[in-house]
Swiss-Prot record:
The entry's keywords: Chloroplast, Cytochrome c-type biogenesis, Membrane, Plastid, Thylakoid, Transmembrane, Transmembrane helix
Record's protein name: Cytochrome c biogenesis protein CcsA
Protein's cellular compartments: Plastid, Chloroplast thylakoid membrane
Family: Belongs to the CcmF/CycK/Ccl1/NrfE/CcsA family.
Organism taxonomic ancestry: Eukaryota, Viridiplantae, Streptophyta, Embryophyta, Tracheophyta
Assembly with partners or alone: May interact with Ccs1.
Membrane-topology descriptor: Multi-pass membrane protein
GO CC list: chloroplast thylakoid membrane
Molecular function GO terms recorded: heme binding
Gene Ontology biological process terms from the UniProt entry: cytochrome complex assembly
Length: 320
């Protein structure tokens, strides 16, 4: 009873704090004045509080359930929210003396995942249950934690790529809207990318263009670093899952929906790294691949659970 009450308190504190953090972040975004520096510092401290609250929540659930809290969708969503908070903490410690724009990605991601986890859709999963026989293995912590941390990093990196595309093609989207022409081929994207590079070189001395150039380069660099980290986690998760599958089901790979989409996710981001090796395709083109990967991750992590079929059906749920 005590642990359940403590978990309930920590859940609501973390959700409330991260909600305040998002509000403060948007205030600092739209009120570009020196007076909001204190507000920004408060938002950073708020994310630290959120991180420790979610950590306490997971530890509490681990203690009273007797197993690592990654046995169902509710627990994995809380762990995913913790992963977003962890990424924010790492970036905060690295750029303690500078403004951390990554919070624009990590804070909304944390509140979205935790908000869904604590919603009425997953009420039946809020109470810890006895671990399913298929999950009673030492591989649970290794496999599932690596997969969820991989999802968290890949989602953050993909969202940074989406932001890069929005900044790069803001004028192009405006032109398309005015002409009511929504056909946007890859060739046009390549042409506009080359055109933007020419304009950048021509107006390099312009402070506005130079700031945009710096911002896009920073987004591209951070996206690559975070996606690289997520890809490593995803690879470790898939390999450890294959070993676990061989022990549990007698086969390293069974091509059930979860495994198939995990392989598709891995392939998409492998293509992303391939585009990074080609100087003609890096930047905007690699960001397009990463943006596509954002949707693929959600299908793999969340969409497959809606089917409720396959060897990973214990993580499914129904929208009742």
């Amino acid at each position: 009873m005590i642990f359940s009450t403590l978990e309930h308190i920590l859940t609501h504190i973390s959700f409330s704090v991260v909600s305040i953090v998002i509000t403060i972040h948007f205030l600092t975004l739209f009120l570009l004045v020196d007076e909001v520096v204190g507000l920004y510092d408060s938002s950073e401290k708020g994310m630290i509080v959120t991180f420790f609250c979610i950590t306490g929540l997971l530890v509490t659930r681990w203690i009273y359930s007797g197993h690592f809290p990654l046995s169902d969708l509710y627990e994995s969503l809380i762990f995913l929210s913790w992963g977003f908070s962890l990424i924010h903490m790492v970036s905060y410690l690295k750029f303690k003396k500078r403004k951390n724009n990554l919070s624009a990605i990590t804070a909304p991601s944390a509140i979205f995942t935790q908000g869904f986890a604590t919603s009425g859709l997953l009420t039946k999963m809020h109470q810890s249950a006895i671990l399913a026989p298929a999950l009673q293995s030492q591989w649970l912590m290794m496999h599932v934690s690596m997969m969820v941390l991989g999802y968290a990093a890949l989602l953050c990196g993909s969202l940074l790529s989406v932001a890069l595309l929005v900044i790069t093609f803001r004028k192009a989207i405006k032109i398309i809207g005015e002409n009511n022409n929504f056909s946007f081929s890859f060739g046009k994207i390549q042409y506009m990318n080359e055109r933007s590079n020419v304009l950048l070189n021509t107006y390099f001395l312009s402070s506005k263009n130079y700031y945009r150039y710096q911002l896009t380069q920073q987004l591209d660099r951070w996206s690559y670093r975070i996606i690289s980290l997520g890809f490593i986690f995803l690879t470790i998760g898939i390999l450890s899952g294959a070993v676990w599958a061989n022990e549990a089901w007698g086969s390293y790979w069974n091509w059930d929906p979860k495994e198939t989409w995990a392989f598709i996710t891995w392939t998409v981001f492998a293509i992303y790294f391939h585009t990074r090796t080609n100087t003609n395709l890096e930047g905007v083109n690699s960001a397009l691949v990463a943006s596509m990967g954002f949707l693929i991750i959600w299908i793999c992590y969340f969409g497959v659970n809606l089917l409720g079929i396959g060897l990973h059906s214990y993580g499914s749920f129904t929208l009742n």
